[in-house]
Structure formats: structure tokens, C-alpha cells
Amino acid sequence: MRCSRCQGAVLLLMNRRFLLPLVASAWLVANLRADEVAQAAEKAHSELWRRFIDAYGIMIDFADMDGKVSLPTPEECREGKPNALGWRAPIENGAMFNGLYMDSSVNRWKRTQAAADAEKARKLMQGLLLLNSISDVKGFVGRGVSTDGKSHYAMGSNDQTLPWFLGLWRYWQSGIATNAEKAKIAQHLVTTAEEIVRLGWKMPAEPPFGTRGSFEGFHFEEVSRKLFTMKALHAVTGAAKWQSMYLDELAKRGGEKNLSKREICEGGMVFWYSKTHNWTSCAAVGALRGLWEMESDAALKAEFAKGLAASAKLAAEALPLAQQWDNADTSPFEMNWRVMNADWKPQTTEKEAQELAMVQIKSFLKVAPRRGKETAFIREPTAAAWIVTLCPDATVLKAHTPEVEKVITRYDFTKLYYSQFFWVEMAWERLKNRS
């Protein structure tokens, strides 16, 4: 018996001798990996602020490795060159990108509590307010500004305006905003929302175009955008009418399956105009996350959580696209976007502007193949990564975290022309916030 006990003790010591190094090794690997991911996110942050945030606090679409880019002149903006939508110009997506990126900026400040990070979030907020102050058209949200800090393209869009609402709401409730800033933001939100409602939930545009895009409809994106706008306005103003509109809207039915908007939210993101479009749908998922955060009804909150989980699972399918990116790629990006003016012609309607833009883009990608690669293998999987991290279900998030981390560490940000890797930082801040 005594011998048996001795043998057991020896085995225990041997197991410990082997197990302890294994545990220590696993711990070291995990920590090294965490450091690698954190460093990649910090590099993305540094590169974004070095090259892509303009003097007015607005994120531009692209720049060279020194942060230089030729902006559209005021005359080109007025004439709609290369097109009145500003598609493939360097000031195409300022409202969209600023509004989305605010999520990362606020989460970064909450993590660091650094005054410098609060000021960065404030600068983005000021850029968003500027984009709502550059036109005589009430409720207009611009895409970006020209060299004079005011001139702009005549049309924004629903893709620009929802992130504008989302970003300002996120800043308003962050803890950074002063009382004066909160009041100013509320004024802009109310004025813009009221005008959109007056136009039947269409986005205001300048003459001769009238409007561009809508929050009305029964696609997930439209449903989430409209509900979020109502709920956010109620949160910011306390006005009962917005909550009443919100509750009525939830019950409305329509679409191919005659689902209620509540049910559509529960189903989550759906791709419908191409195989994947995480980069345009992510704002609607961000809006759903905002609805989940603001909702006090337990049953409704649970349904929003299901929608976020479904969205995360769908988005995760695009994460492997990041591995198709080649950091050594040297294909032409073509900084001179004005080559598109070869196809330019005057536009007087939204349809004419979009048709022109599509012709221009098709030709442009032939001389600028790098642009297509960055959008396919950087923009799409990084936006998907952020969508995954918006899910409040820890089990779902844990299952996809390794793949999200692979996306974050995939790129050499100093060699990218497009700013559309900013979702990398957004995803990491949410992972860090969860941990």
C-alpha cells in the first residue's frame, strides 16, 4: 500500500512537471497574441490620424503614403465632377466614416480616459456638425468639404445620414460631451430629423436633385435606420412623440414575408444587392446595437440581441476575405481621380448622376485595379469584423474572436491608400471593452 502511494506521488510530480510548462507556454502565447493584436490596432489608429482626418475633423476616403491628396475644387463640386454624388472622389464618405468611427473614438476614450482621446472624439463630432452646416437646404448632411472648407457635392444619401445620426448620438451619450455640446447636437439632430420626416423619410439634397435615399421600407437596413432615428431622438430630447412613433413603427408590417419591423430586426442583417455588403450594412447593425442599448423592454431587447447575433454570424462569413489581401501588392491605385472626368456630362437628376458614376467607376477600375482589391479584401472583412463585435452574446463573440483578430493583424496600414481599414480599430476597441 505504501509503495502504491509513493508511485502515485511520483506520477503527480511528473504530471506537474510536464503540465506547468505547458500551461505557462499557453499563457505566454495568448499574451503575445494579445499584444500583437493591440499593436496592430494602435498602428491603425496612428495611421488614420496621420493621413486621413482633414483639417475640419472629417475622414477622407484616400490619400498617398504622405497623407497628400488633391481635393475637388469648389468649382468641381458645383459642377458635379466627377459626378454629383462624389463617388470615387476623396470626399465621398465623410459623414458615413466619421459617424461610424465615433464608436471607436468613444470606446478608446472610455478605456484610456486620456484628454487627447476625448479631443479626437470632439474633433470628429465637430466635423459631423460642419457637414450639417454647409448648405442652405435644411437637414442636408454633406459627404465632405472642398479646399475652402464649405463647398461640397449636392447629394448626400441614406448611407451618409444614418451614420451621422449614430455618431452624434454616440458622442452625446458618451460622457465626453459638455452640456453646451449636448444642446447643440440636440438642435442639429432635431432639425435634421424633422425635415427628413417632412420629406417622407427621404434625405434632403440640393437643387436640382431634391432628395437622395430614404429610411422608408422593409429591408433590414431601412427598418433599423428609421427605428434608431426615432429612438435616439427620444433619448436626446425626451419628447414623447418620438417614442410613440417608435412603438407604432415596430408594429408595422410589409415586405415579401409581411413581417413586422420588430420581426425584421430580430432576423438581423440580410444581403440583397450583392453577394456581401458588410460595409454599407454595418451602419444598420450599429443602429440595431444602439436600439439594444437604449431599449428598456426586456422582451424587445432580447429580440434585438437575436438580430445582432444573426448579423454577427452572417458577417463572420466574410472574415476570411482578409487572408486574400497581399501586403506586397503593387498594382496601380491611381491617385488622379480626375481621369474619370473623361466621361463627365452634366447631371440634373439623381438617376443621371448615378448612371454616370457607374460608367465612370467601371472605366476607372481598369486603370486602378488596386482600388478594387482594397475594397474587396480590406473594406469588406474589416467592416464584417466590427459587425461581429457589436453582438452582446459573449458565446457568439468568443466563437469568432480568433478570426476577428486575424483580420486586425493582417494588414500593413502604412501601405494602404484607402482609409477604409478604420473598422479594424473599431473591432479591437469593442473586443477590448468586452474583456
Identify the meaning behind each predicted range.
Residues 35-51, 177-178, 278, 284-435:
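Terminal, non-catalytic domain-edge segments
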Residues 58-89, 137-157, 205-225, 263-290, ...:
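Carbohydrate-binding/catalytic loop surfaces
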Residues 90-110, 123, 146, 150, ...:
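Non-membrane alpha-helical segments in proteins
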Residues 23-28:
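Hydrophobic helical h-region of N-terminal Sec-dependent signal peptides
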Residues 34-96, 122-123, 127-144, 180-187, ...:
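Low-complexity, Ser/Thr/Pro/Gly-enriched N-terminal "stalk/linker" regions
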